Structure formats: structure tokens, C-alpha cells
């Protein structure tokens, strides 16, 4: 009999015979042809009596004068003995009067099957049988977390602004909108946060941002955008992070918070993304426009003052004509010289025409050409990297160069940080169509990169002496 409690392996084999055979014939052939083959320790009859071999199961069928089927032998032997026993079955070449062939197809580990069943059952028990207790335990855990968060919250400045415990000591801080945002970030271990309490940024926060690396983390709505605009005017911000569209920072879970902070962008790039630069331009352009108008107004006032004496002289002329009434026709003759004035004007118009033609052929165009030829005055470093810089304009791409200024690799600007971290192929220069930020500059210094060429510089607090930075203004 098969002892299911001690079965470790099941030997799977298939049999084919040139004739019609039945189960007793196959079982008899197995016992008969393996008897004495492997010695007394592995004799099938003795192993079955002691329970180390279970009941031999046979499933066969006859079709077209031939028999095919499967044989299953349970075993509680170890792996070596089970393998020897399985190999001995393949030595059987006849079953009854028919030629037969047995082939081992699989040795199944019963314990592995049991382990799979245990895992599946445990999943079911965990998900279905513990559901009733989860809400109550979750409420207890939330209550404990809430009490810990309230104890960890501190207050900064005279206005007692809610903040995390590490705001003063940390080199980098996260600026959020309200007290609930600080609590939510404390819940997930982010302790260097401080809130602004709306669009009216407290002076303490504005002063604190000048001393640290600041990331503004706001809601994914219009209010969050307004807070960013306010911070850009009164505070010093390095990076901007936004919650997903339509969500608030206080409602985010840990995965969403980490993703949003990892996707932060430099403030220079955010100015273009959130169209803050376009809103700020009219403010700068209006002031010079007003100044120019103010300077023009005095000129317009001076001109009518000059015309007033001319108007005053006109009434003096008719006074002379009144003294000589008969000579009133003479002014008409004097009006004829107006034709001469017209002639003079024609002469004057002719002379400018003659002067205009040489003006068109004059050297301003020639003078413009040397203005375009200014690259001759560029520094040797700028001339060295100008071909790469010109080729990358508008592509948002980057080139990694070796000591001979040959291209090692090309990548996108958004992947430049990861590429520099992973690449150790002797990069000496990096030319890219983007902003030179503090992060890229630090990585370049760590990697031994000598030259960084970008569109413009970001908010750089520390510039390593070992890295030479060039921007579009150098070209």
C-alpha cells in the first residue's frame, strides 16, 4: 500500500508494447525483471513490504494491436535511491509475450507540490480570513501614527510656522503649503519640511530659503501654481515638485510622494513649463516703456513751444499789409516763390535720391558681416566646443566627449544625470542643450570631468574649481 504520509517522490513513466497487455502483466514484469538486479536493499518486493515503495499505479489502453499507457510509482527513498530505482525500470524490454519499452518522463517532488499548495492556501487565508479584523487594527495604527506625528511637529520663528524637526539642521528643506502637508510628510519620515500657510509667504520662510537648498512641493492644482509664483518673487528656490494633477500633498501616499519628489525639476526649467517667465516679462518691459514715454513727452511739449513764436509772427505780417492795402497783391506774388520752394523741395528730394542710392550700397551691410564674424574673438575653449554646441541647439540632447573631443556617447538631457553616474569611460567634456545645474556640476566634479557646456547656468551655490563651465553667452 502507498503510505501517503512518507511519500517524497513519484516516478512517472510511459510504456509502449507491440501487442495487447494488461495491468497485471505490467506489474508482474516490473517485479520479475528487477528482482535481484539491484541487490536486497533495493528489491521492490521488500521495499513495498516496508512501505518505502507505494502501490504501483498503471493506466494503459490498447489500440490497433498496440498498448500504450503510464506507470506511477510512489517512493519514500532518498533522491539517489529513487533515481537508481527509476533507471532500473528502463531495463524492462518484454511484458508477457510482447516486446515493450518503458521510458522515465518525470520524477515529481511531492514536497514541492505541497509547498505550492501551502503558499496558495496561506494567501487565501491572509486575504479572506483576516479582513474582518483589519479595519479595527488599522484604526489603532492610524491613531498611534497620528499621535507620533503631532509630537514630532515643531514650530519655526515668531509666527510659529509648522515645520519638521530637522528644518534648522538640514542643508535641504521642502516647502509645502499647509500644516496638513507637513503632517503627511512626517508620517512617511520626511522631517525637513516647512509650510508657508498659503500664498502669503512669511518673512521667516523667505529668509530661511536663502541659506538652504529648497524644493517647493505644492498641490497639483491652480493654487499650487500660484504659490510657486509667490515663492519665486520673495524666496530663493532651487527645485519645484508638483503633486499629480488634481491631488493635494496631504492626500498622497508614500509611493506618490517619493515619485513626485524624484521628478522635481530645476527652477529654470519650471519657469518655462509653468509659463511663469511669460507673466514676468511684461513687468520688466512695461517699466522701460513707461520711461521711454516720459522722455518723449518733454520733446513733444518743446516742439509746440517752438511753433508758438511762428504763429505769433503771422499776425505781424498782416499788420504790414494793412499799412499798404494796395500792395495786397504782392503777397500773392510772394506766394509764387512757394513754387520755388516746391522746386527747392524737388531739388532737395532729388539730392536725397542721389544720396539714397549710395546709402543702399554703403558699408552697413559690410559692417554687419564683421559683426557676424565675431567668433574670431571667441576664447580657445569656446572655439573648441562650438561645433558640438551648434549641432545640439534645439535637440535637448547631450554629447559625452573624451580627451580628444571625440564623441563617446550621445543621450537625452533628461537622462544625462543617470548616464554620467553609470558611465566610467574617461569622459572629459560634456556638451548638452540644457541648464547647468548644481547637481550636474557636482557629478561632473566627482567623475573628473573638466568641461561642462550648456545653454545657461542655473542656481549654482558652489562651483568646483576643477570644472570649467561654458554657456551660450560664451559663444
From Swiss-Prot:
Matches recorded under HAMAP family: DNA_primase_DnaG_arc
Organism for this UniProt entry: Methanococcoides burtonii (strain DSM 6242 / NBRC 107633 / OCM 468 / ACE-M)
This protein's UniProt keywords: DNA replication, DNA-directed RNA polymerase, Exosome, Magnesium, Metal-binding, Nucleotidyltransferase, Primosome, Transcription, Transferase
Task of the protein: RNA polymerase that catalyzes the synthesis of short RNA molecules used as primers for DNA polymerase during DNA replication. Also part of the exosome, which is a complex involved in RNA degradation. Acts as a poly(A)-binding protein that enhances the interaction between heteromeric, adenine-rich transcripts and the exosome.
Cofactor(s) the record lists: Mg(2+)
Molecular function terms from GO: DNA-directed RNA polymerase activity; metal ion binding; poly(A) binding
Highest taxon in the source lineage: Archaea
Protein name per its UniProtKB record: DNA primase DnaG
Residue span, Toprim domain: 171-257
Gene3D superfamilies for the chain: 3.40.1360.10
Coiled-coil stretches: none
Subunit structure: Forms a ternary complex with MCM helicase and DNA. Component of the archaeal exosome complex.
Reaction it catalyzes: ssDNA + n NTP = ssDNA/pppN(pN)n-1 hybrid + (n-1) diphosphate
InterPro entries reported in the protein's UniProt record: DnaG_primase, Primase_DnaG_arc, TOPRIM_DnaG/twinkle, TOPRIM_dom
Amino acid at each position: 500500500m502507498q503510505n501517503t504520509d512518507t511519500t517524497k517522490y513519484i516516478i512517472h513513466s510511459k510504456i509502449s508494447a507491440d501487442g495487447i497487455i494488461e495491468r497485471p502483466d505490467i506489474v508482474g514484469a516490473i517485479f520479475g525483471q528487477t528482482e535481484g538486479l539491484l541487490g536486497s536493499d533495493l528489491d521492490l518486493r521488500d521495499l513495498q513490504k516496508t512501505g518505502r515503495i507505494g502501490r504501483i499505479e498503471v493506466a494503459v489502453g490498447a489500440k490497433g494491436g498496440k498498448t500504450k499507457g503510464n506507470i506511477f510509482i510512489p517512493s519514500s527513498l532518498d533522491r539517489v535511491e529513487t533515481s537508481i530505482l527509476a533507471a532500473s525500470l528502463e531495463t524492462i524490454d518484454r511484458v508477457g509475450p510482447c516486446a515493450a519499452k518503458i521510458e522515465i518522463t518525470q520524477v515529481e517532488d511531492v514536497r514541492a507540490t505541497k509547498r505550492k499548495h501551502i503558499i496558495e492556501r496561506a494567501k487565501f487565508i491572509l486575504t479572506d480570513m483576516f479582513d474582518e479584523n483589519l479595519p479595527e487594527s488599522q484604526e489603532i495604527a492610524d491613531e498611534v501614527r497620528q499621535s507620533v506625528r503631532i509630537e514630532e511637529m515643531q514650530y519655526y520663528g515668531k509666527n510659529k510656522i509648522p515645520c519638521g524637526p530637522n528644518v534648522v539642521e538640514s542643508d535641504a528643506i521642502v516647502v509645502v503649503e499647509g500644516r496638513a502637508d507637513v503632517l503627511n510628510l512626517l508620517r512617511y519620515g520626511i522631517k525637513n519640511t516647512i509650510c508657508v500657510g498659503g500664498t502669503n509667504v512669511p518673512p521667516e520662510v523667505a529668509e530661511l530659503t536663502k541659506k538652504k537648498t529648497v524644493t517647493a512641493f505644492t498641490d497639483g492644482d491652480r493654487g499650487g501654481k500660484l504659490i510657486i509664483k509667490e515663492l519665486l518673487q520673495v524666496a530663493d528656490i532651487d527645485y519645484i515638485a508638483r503633486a499629480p494633477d488634481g491631488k493635494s500633498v496631504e492626500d498622497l501616499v508614500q509611493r506618490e510622494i517619493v515619485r513626485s519628489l524624484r521628478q522635481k525639476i530645476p527652477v529654470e526649467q519650471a519657469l518655462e513649463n509653468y509659463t511663469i517667465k511669460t507673466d514676468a516679462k511684461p513687468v520688466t518691459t512695461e517699466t522701460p516703456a513707461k520711461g521711454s514715454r516720459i522722455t518723449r513727452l518733454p520733446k513733444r511739449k518743446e516742439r509746440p513751444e517752438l511753433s508758438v513764436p511762428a504763429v505769433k509772427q503771422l499776425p505781424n505780417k498782416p499788420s504790414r499789409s494793412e499799412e499798404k492795402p494796395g500792395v495786397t497783391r504782392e503777397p500773392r506774388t510772394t506766394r509764387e516763390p512757394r513754387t520755388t520752394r516746391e522746386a527747392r523741395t524737388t531739388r532737395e528730394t532729388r539730392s536725397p535720391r542721389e544720396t539714397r542710392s549710395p546709402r543702399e550700397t554703403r558699408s552697413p551691410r559690410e559692417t554687419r558681416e564683421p559683426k557676424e564674424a565675431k567668433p574670431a574673438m571667441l576664447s580657445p575653449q569656446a572655439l573648441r566646443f562650438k561645433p558640438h554646441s551648434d549641432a545640439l541647439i534645439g535637440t535637448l540632447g547631450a554629447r559625452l566627449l573624451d580627451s580628444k573631443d571625440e564623441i563617446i556617447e550621445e543621450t537625452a538631457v533628461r537622462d544625462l544625470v543617470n548616464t554620467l553616474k553609470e558611465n566610467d569611460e574617461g569622459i572629459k567634456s560634456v556638451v548638452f542643450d540644457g541648464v547647468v545645474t548644481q547637481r550636474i556640476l557636482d557629478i561632473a566634479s566627482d567623475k573628473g570631468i573638466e568641461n561642462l557646456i550648456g545653454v545657461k547656468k542655473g542656481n549654482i551655490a558652489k562651483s568646483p574649481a576643477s570644472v570649467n563651465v561654458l554657456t551660450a553667452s560664451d559663444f
